């Protein structure tokens, strides 16, 4: 009881501090934008060439996985088919692009986002390259567009024509400044649409044609024809603490799962922090650990053979869904309709667990709740290991110590449609 009262008292203070930090971050970003824009005056005058198109996609791996099926629409459309198309991409997903999507564009420019944000020399080198290419048109299809990345790269390219989606950051001043840089703006009819469906609609609006699939689809080159096995993969990290299920909970879940089911539990992650967490979980549970040891493409191959995938709200969710594997998301509710409510989006084979505090708030405000941002670290920690195990068993349709259908020689792979 005392703990509950203390949490209720701490929550408003934590949210107040977070909102103050957000306002300060917005002010810093706006100041940096003006400063960096001034630096761009050193670039030579633009000389755009007819039918040169630049597509700017600088967000992270998960976002790209929800976009990539729509990229080829540009080449196949009557509007852009005769253009020389260049993709300005985030180097973090270069491996997946090269293996699976290289024929969607004519050329690429890769950006190391960390170096871009931290090194003035590297940043100017990218800008100079964009200015030298002479693009007639720039399309920025991201739903949430960073001023310092997408928009400054659009300014560096200096096209005759700019096309984008109306920006939807939480700061109106940011969005107004961003949107003024483009001549054509896509205004989504449904602000609550899942990210995959938003990307589909943007491509249809900008190209006149749309991807025919109803869910993300990733077909790996030289993929093994081996049926999915009995192993589950647990992606144990996330890039913010409020989205990260604690190591203690993962340990509780793995011990409970292994007491009831056969097959390996494999820990995955990428960052140094995730590798350290995975090592701790491995020491406590004996789970297999591949965190930080495999390439993105090899990770995708392993996911394609998994019985199921469990993850916080990370790129791993979108990778697993794209490979049509049963996927359980342990989420805090932030941007839930865009990234974690797959079931509502009509995409099968995915289940999501939210904190009780989030579910209570959503029931009280169903019509006003699509832009939820008030998650704390304690919220996701409140999701119990028993709840996760129960939902996983329902998702994969397995009883304790029952091998999955794939391992018994069935000719189906389970999961969604």
Model regions: which residues?
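Catalytic machinery of carbohydrate-active enzymes
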Residues: 1-417
């Amino acid at each position: 009881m005392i703990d509950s009262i203390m949490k209720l008292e701490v929550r408003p203070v934590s949210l107040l501090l977070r909102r103050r930090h957000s306002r300060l971050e917005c002010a810093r970003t706006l100041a940096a934008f003006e400063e960096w824009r001034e630096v761009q005056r050193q670039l030579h005058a633009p000389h755009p060439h007819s039918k040169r198109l630049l597509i700017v996609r600088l967000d992270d791996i998960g976002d790209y996985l929800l976009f990539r099926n729509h990229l080829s629409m540009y080449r196949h459309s009557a509007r852009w088919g005769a253009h020389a198309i260049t993709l300005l991409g985030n180097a973090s997903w270069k491996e997946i692009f090269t293996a699976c999507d290289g024929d969607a564009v004519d050329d690429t420019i890769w950006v190391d986002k960390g170096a871009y944000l931290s090194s003035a020399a590297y940043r100017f080198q990218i800008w100079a390259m964009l200015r030298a290419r002479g693009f007639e048109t720039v399309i920025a299809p991201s739903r949430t567009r960073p001023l310092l990345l997408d928009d400054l790269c659009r300014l560096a390219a200096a096209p005759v024509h700019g096309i984008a989606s109306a920006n939807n950051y939480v700061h109106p001043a940011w969005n107004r400044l961003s949107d003024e840089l483009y001549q054509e703006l896509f205004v989504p009819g449904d602000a609550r649409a899942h990210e995959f469906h938003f990307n589909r609609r943007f491509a249809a609006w900008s190209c006149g044609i749309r991807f025919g699939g109803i869910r993300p689809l990733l077909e790996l080159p030289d993929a093994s024809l081996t049926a999915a096995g009995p192993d589950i993969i647990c992606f144990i990290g996330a890039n913010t603490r409020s989205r990260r299920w604690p190591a203690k909970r993962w340990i509780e879940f793995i011990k409970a799962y292994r007491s009831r089911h056969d097959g390996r539990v494999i820990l995955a992650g990428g960052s140094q922090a995730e590798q350290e967490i995975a090592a701790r979980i491995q020491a406590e549970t004996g789970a297999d650990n591949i965190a930080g040891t495999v390439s993105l493409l090899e990770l995708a191959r392993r996911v394609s053979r998994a019985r199921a995938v469990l993850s916080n709200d990370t790129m791993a969710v979108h990778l697993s869904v794209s490979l049509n594997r049963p996927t359980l998301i342990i989420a805090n509710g932030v941007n839930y309709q865009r990234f974690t409510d797959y079931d509502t989006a009509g995409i099968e084979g995915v289940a999501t667990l939210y904190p009780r505090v989030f579910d209570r708030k959503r029931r009280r405000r169903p019509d006003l709740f699509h832009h939820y941002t008030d998650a704390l670290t304690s919220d996701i920690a409140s999701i119990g290991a028993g709840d996760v195990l129960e939902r996983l068993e329902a998702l994969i349709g397995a009883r304790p110590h029952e091998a999955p259908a794939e391992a018994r020689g069935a000719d189906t792979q389970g999961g969604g449609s």
